[in-house]
Curated annotation (Swiss-Prot):
Organism: Homo sapiens (Human)
Region Essential for interaction with EXOC1, residue ranges: 695-706
Gene: SLC6A9
UniProt KW DNA damage keyword: no
Gene Ontology terms, MF aspect: amino acid:sodium symporter activity; glycine transmembrane transporter activity; glycine:sodium symporter activity
Coarse class of the protein's main subcellular location: membrane
CDD domains found in the cross-reference section: SLC6sbd_GlyT1
Protein name: Sodium- and chloride-dependent glycine transporter 1
Protein family membership: Belongs to the sodium:neurotransmitter symporter (SNF) (TC 2.A.22) family. SLC6A9 subfamily.
């Protein structure tokens, strides 16, 4: 080792977990690491010009260990960390990463991820896709796509975030030129977080409106109803608070004039809740009841995330499990109703001829891709709070299967009630089936009015929607907050993370106000159709290419083996390299070929609105090439090819976040020079230096003399 290399190298001997530091017995056992925090000991003797650095450091270590100075130093170091807030409570003593924190236990992570993946789409989109694409036959391509695309991508994102212990921006130290992928994920999460909370606020509004003896959308005798209203129930027979029976003449009138007549639930939704304007450009007034519910929704999200994953991890014990209780209650009630079996058979009866249609496979792939939350950044973020050796392979399988099983289960709940409604009206199930907001706020609420004690069932249904939405919203907000905090990375923002969460929540509330106007539903559906559509496919495809082919599949497989103790199974290796990217490309092509201009009921969106939608979609995708060009301009290199190589190779700080996990090829050997960006203290003439490596290299304790 040359003299220049010895200027800041330090010794880090092996440590015994149960008995504290163990002094090395030979220079070969000394590992040289960069200086991060320094404690100073009195001058030592024994180092001569002919003595090697390792031998000198070894003598210092033996002297400090045998004299008891080293344990005192380590105790003082721990005390200083505690005083600085690094060890604030007994809970964090269980954390591996004192800087960022970890989940309280593994159940919290699994429940949070289940709540993130299982959202409103499982209830209002999957059942509709299933019956439209061949009923039970749709299950075949659905689970094929789950096995070959869904679970592999889910595992990739979980392992990516867990290995680096960073959010969707920090993980791109793996290949800095592709950091734009992380920014694209942030943009997507921002869009979804804005409009998703508006859907939750509408569910809050319906929940509060259900706290009444008679549901306000049950009859046509309200001030907002028109002459075209024809309900299943006849308000004229409402006497002494009794529930009327549907009159055959009224039903006949409703069915014969279905094109001209509207249901009371539809008029309640369109004329009272939304006060819908006639055009997307006509904002009208802000609906104050919805604005208030939006504030409640954002307040709930903020309070649940006020301490990051420490608080949200406790909330999900309820928010991620109670929806299953409600689903089970609604299922038991639904299957006992007359006509429920017809609805379930309509949902499950296979039409095998549709398996040969490309559209069915495209819908199956798209539903798997979107329902699991891939490329949103949330999976990477949630996994970044795992402990390093957590078995994320097992978690990815459990969570993915739970998500898909929930979708199938929700289909039974939805179609049992819709079958009852169709039987009551004497029409085919297809006449009452719907998806999206039309199912959640029109069709299903109307079906609930036919049940005894209908307000109770309505309360349960909308409470379930609220919890399903909040589970996803927690992760969307945490994705943005974690990305900001990790990117800044200093001690101040770590201590002020609550204020960052508050700032993001307030910004989300303000940006959501236009969606509570009379034209709000038009903008909500525009964002839903464009902001998180093909852009997710592009982001996910580039992520696969960057990890598997730029960073290298062998490197990534070795990383996973170091983290989990075993390499990814051969099936996942093949899927990551070939199958999943091919499926993603198929989804992208299918999305382009099957593109149709957006409509809402019979309203056709104008060209300028569609253009805004495409701009929203492109805004997340363009982050990738724009940041790549920026990175190339900032990277050293004599030629473009050299710059490209330097910009795509992993940065110096890529790898496990904690030094105790940086083994093998990640184990540092020689301290970098000051020009590498590390601060190296000069050797002091009158005292020897034994640097004690801390958990945060950006801050340094003061001179400590013993």
């Amino acid at each position: 080792m040359s003299g220049g290399d010895t200027r800041a190298a330090i010794a880090r001997p092996r440590m015994a977990a149960a008995h504290g530091p163990v002094a090395p017995s030979s220079p070969e056992q000394v590992t040289l690491l960069p200086v991060q925090r320094s404690f100073f000991l009195p001058p030592f003797s024994g180092a001569t010009p002919s003595t090697s650095l390792a031998e000198s450091v070894l003598k210092v270590w033996h002297g400090a260990y045998n004299s008891g100075l080293l344990p005192q130093l380590m105790a003082q170091h721990s005390l200083a960390m505690a005083q600085n807030g690094a060890v604030p409570s007994e809970a964090t003593k269980r954390d591996q990463n004192l800087k960022r924190g970890n989940w309280g236990n593994q159940i919290e992570f699994v429940l949070t991820s289940v709540g993130y993946a299982v959202g409103l789409g499982n209830v209002w989109r999957f059942p509709y896709l299933c019956y439209r694409n061949g009923g039970g036959a749709f299950m075949f391509p659905y689970f094929i796509m789950l096995i070959f695309c869904g679970i592999p991508l889910f595992f990739m994102e979980l392992s990516f975030g867990q290995f680096a212990s960073q959010g969707c921006l920090g993980v791109w130290r793996i290949s800095p030129m592709f950091k734009g992928v992380g920014y694209g994920m942030m943009v997507v999460s921002t869009y979804i977080g804005i409009y998703y909370n508006v859907v939750i606020c509408i569910a809050f509004y319906y929940f509060f409106s259900s706290m009444t003896h008679v549901l306000p959308w049950a009859y046509c005798n309200n001030p907002w109803n028109t002459h075209d209203c024809a309900g299943v129930l006849d308000a004229s027979n409402l006497t002494n608070g009794s529930r009327p029976a549907a009159l055959p003449s009224n039903l006949s009138h409703l069915l014969n004039h279905s094109l001209q007549r509207t249901s009371p639930s539809e008029e309640y939704w369109r004329l009272y809740v939304l006060k819908l304007s006639d055009d997307i450009g006509n904002f009208g007034e802000v609906r104050l009841p919805l604005l208030g519910c939006l504030g409640v929704s954002w307040l709930v999200v903020f309070l649940c995330l006020i301490r990051g994953v420490k608080s949200s991890g406790k909330v999900v014990y309820f928010t991620a499990t109670f929806p299953y209780v409600v689903l089970t209650i609604l299922f038991v009630r639904g299957v006992t109703l007359e006509g429920a079996f017809d609805g379930i058979m309509y949902y499950l009866t296979p039409q095998w001829d549709k398996i040969l249609e490309a559209k069915v496979w495209g819908d199956a792939a798209s539903q798997i891709f979107y329902s699991l939350g891939c490329a949103w950044g949330g999976l990477i973020t949630m996994a970044s709070y795992n402990k390093f050796h957590n078995n994320c392979y097992r978690d990815s399988v459990i969570i993915s299967i739970t998500n898909c099983a929930t979708s199938v289960y929700a289909g039974f709940v939805i179609f049992s009630i819709l079958g009852f409604m169709a039987n009551h009206l004497g029409v085919d199930v297809s006449r009452v089936a719907d998806h999206g907001p039309g199912l959640a706020f029109v069709a299903y609420p109307e079906a609930l009015t036919l049940l005894p004690i209908s307000p109770l069932w309505s309360l349960l249904f909308f409470f379930m929607l609220i919890l399903l939405g909040l589970g996803t919203q927690f992760c969307l907000l945490e994705t943005l907050v974690t990305a900001i905090v990790d990117e800044v990375g200093n001690e101040w923002i770590l201590q002020k993370k609550t204020y960052v969460t508050l700032g993001v929540a307030v910004a989300g509330f303000l940006l959501g106000i236009p969606l509570t106007s009379q034209a709000g539903i038009y903008w909500l559906l525009l964002m839903d159709n464009y902001a998180a559509s093909f852009s997710l496919v592009v982001i996910s495809c580039i992520m696969c290419v960057a990890i598997m082919y730029i960073y290298g599949h062998r490197n990534y497989f070795q990383d996973i083996q170091m983290m989990l103790g075993f390499p990814p199974p051969l099936f996942f290796q093949i899927c990551w390299r070939f199958v999943s990217p091919a499926i993603i490309f198929f989804i992208l092509v299918f999305t382009v070929i099957q593109y149709q201009p957006i409509t809402y009921n019979h309203y056709q969106y104008p060209g300028w609105a569609v253009a805004i939608g495409f701009l929203m979609a492109l805004s997340s995708v363009l982050c990738i090439p724009l940041y790549a060009m920026f990175r190339l301009c900032r990277t050293d290199g004599d030629t473009l090819l050299q710059r490209l190589k330097n910009a795509t190779k992993p940065s110096r700080d890529w790898g496990p976040a904690l030094l105790e996990h940086r083994t093998g090829r990640y184990a540092p050997t020689i301290a970098p020079s000051p020009e590498d960006g590390f601060e190296v203290q000069p050797l002091h003439p009158d005292k020897a230096q034994i640097p004690i490596v801390g958990s945060n290299g950006s801050s340094r304790l003061q001179d400590s003399r013993i």
